[in-house]
Amino acid sequence: MAERSSEFVFTGNPARVIFGAGRMRNVREEVERLGRGRVLLLGSENLREVCDQVQDLLGELFVNRYDGAAMHTPVEVTDIALAQLRTSEADCVVAIGGGSTTGLAKALAARTGVDQVILPTTYAGSEVTPVLGETVEGRKTTRSTLAVLPETVIYDVELSKNLPVPIAVASAVNALAHAVEAMYSPDANPVVDTWALEAAQALARGLRGLVSDPSCRRIRTDLLRGSWLAGMCLGSVGMAVHHKLCHTLGGAFGLPHAPTHTVVLPYAMSFNASEVPDVMDSLASAMNVSNAPAGVWDLIADAGGPTSLASLGLLQTDLDRAADLATEAPYRNPRQITRSGIRDLLQSAWEGNRPPE
């Protein structure tokens, strides 16, 4: 990797992380450590059994539960949960799930200042970031504020070990995207570089392992640890074209969050590769591939993940509007953002062919 400037700024995000198999058992202790005693439990319909277990662990600290977390954090869902929070006089939320449930917890914190304890069941990574994305009338917007950074995150590999392989693949590549874009962020620094490369290595190793032994605890631990490190990257530096496109496609066209990240990442990397060859070389080395964009596409394809926007249901006739939305406002990126360049990127991602080396 080419030498970076010796000048940089690094700000650590203040959060407590508990990592290990079976650590879900600490949830009550962590709520009490925050000095809280009335918990609104957040989950989703597909995690009812796990939510029941956590509810039992909380005992009398539990006061109410909302199982309606939705993708892309629509404000109308937040309003329903907010009413429950206030009616219950809850002073803490415990969120179980992936990015949707974490997003709901953050949205509640943004509105009330309520404390958050997060138990991730996927590899989203948003649980260790001060970033909140919300969807209002079909448009997804993001903001960054420490007011939404969860106080405590409990990483229990038992909660993600049975994550179905297709969901695990998409979620892991979502995490990988955080590490990749952190490497070429204008805010990049040696601390984040170290996290990003370690995350890329662990996630690539985990993606390969999912194919051969999806139930292996070591593989699932690699993925969970990689997602945590990648999330730390996301929470520390600004992101670029990949994240902008994914937010546009999710908010405006309703595409699923993690699969969209999975499809777009190799093409966003290819789009920027000529401007940051040092970054791509370092990532390729960490992931043990010869070419970073093509190597990521191979990892996804070999693991059975989606490789085209067409497969996610996006119509070719949607690409022009997507390009317009993604270039409405300027944002930082290694390669200059133009409407034609983004339209070409989207076309490549829609077709789904392997990026050239």
Swiss-Prot record:
Recorded catalytic activity of this chain's protein? 3-oxoadipate + NAD(+) = maleylacetate + NADH + H(+); 3-oxoadipate + NADP(+) = maleylacetate + NADPH + H(+)
GO biological process assignments: catabolic process
For this protein, what is the EC number? 1.3.1.32
A Pfam family found in this protein is ADH_Fe_C
Q: Which InterPro entries match?
A: ADH_Fe/GldA, ADH_Fe_C, Alcohol_dehydrogenase_Fe, MAR
Q: Which UniProt keywords apply?
A: Aromatic hydrocarbons catabolism, NAD, Oxidoreductase
- Give this protein's Gene Ontology molecular function annotations: alcohol dehydrogenase (NAD+) activity; maleylacetate reductase activity; metal ion binding
Give the pathway listed in the UniProt entry for this protein.
Aromatic compound metabolism; 3-chlorocatechol degradation
Primary role: Plays a major role in the degradation of chloroaromatic compounds by channeling maleylacetate and some of its substituted derivatives into the 3-oxoadipate pathway. This enzyme converts maleylacetate and 2-chloromaleylacetate with similar efficiencies.
Query: What does the similarity note say?
Result: Belongs to the iron-containing alcohol dehydrogenase family.
Q: What is this protein called?
A: Maleylacetate reductase 1
